[in-house]
Amino acid sequence: WIMGHMVNAIAQIDEFVNLGANSIETDVSFDDSANPEYTYHGVPCDCGRTCTKWEYFNEFLKGLRKATTPGDSKYHEKLVLVVFDLKTSSLYDNQASDAGKKLAKSLLQNYWNNGNNGGRAYIVLSIPNLAHYKLTTGFKETLTSEGHPELMDKVGYDFSGNDEIGDVAKTYKKAGVTGHVWQSDGITNCLLRGLDRVRKAVANRDSSNGYINKVHYWTVDKRATTRDALDAGVDGIMTNYPDVIADVLNESAYKAKFRIASYDDNPWETFKN
């Protein structure tokens, strides 16, 4: 999965997919009442990027729905996965469940079109704080109570705080989450970060009793770092330059071993050689 980083304006969906992304990451900010409000990152952000592009969240969802609904004039067949980077640090811990409920309602209405031929992309809810795990339960409860538990088949999870792998495992246990787990690791492109924790995450993914299904590394803009991440065995790379990742995947060393994921590749299934 080549994951376009910080895609917060509808116009950027086309831009990143046309550069080679089959997945995008979108920032979601919340208001004081835990309503998802804007797709917005703000300052500071990655080096070389404009930090202030934004849409109202529900409007972004409608644009995203068009981009992922077969037959729509804006449809991109290869856009198959969307990571919502949920900026919950503005909320109190006890608002996490409400944030999940309100997020589910927004997605149900504006993205899934109330279950009637909505967008088809898989969705990862990426949460920065382990203490906010009840966002996942609030989300699930709402889809169930609104009569669409089947949409949970399209939903996965990530805790993005670079926490100890063991602590993340415990948190999923508390949340009652088994499966559909992505594990992110990374840092802004302005700084360097080693691959030690990525290797631990990959080892967990490949063990018989691990909780992780997929591992992705962010934010990678350089060819050398891309190669290092691929050598470590990641499933996804988040980037500001999808074309750079696509170029490296075309190199003879990687062409035989990796390919770009399509809609038929289940993002919740651990890949077995």
Swiss-Prot record:
Compartments reported by the entry: Secreted
A Pfam entry, by short name: GDPD_2
GO biological process, one term: lipid catabolic process
EC number(s) per entry: 4.6.1.-
Tissue-by-tissue expression: Expressed by the venom gland.
Cofactors demanded by this protein: Mg(2+)
Keywords: Cytolysis, Dermonecrotic toxin, Disulfide bond, Glycoprotein, Hemolysis, Lipid degradation, Lipid metabolism, Lyase, Magnesium, Metal-binding, Secreted, Toxin
This protein's name: Dermonecrotic toxin LdSicTox-alphaIB1av
The species this protein was found in: Loxosceles deserta (Desert recluse spider)
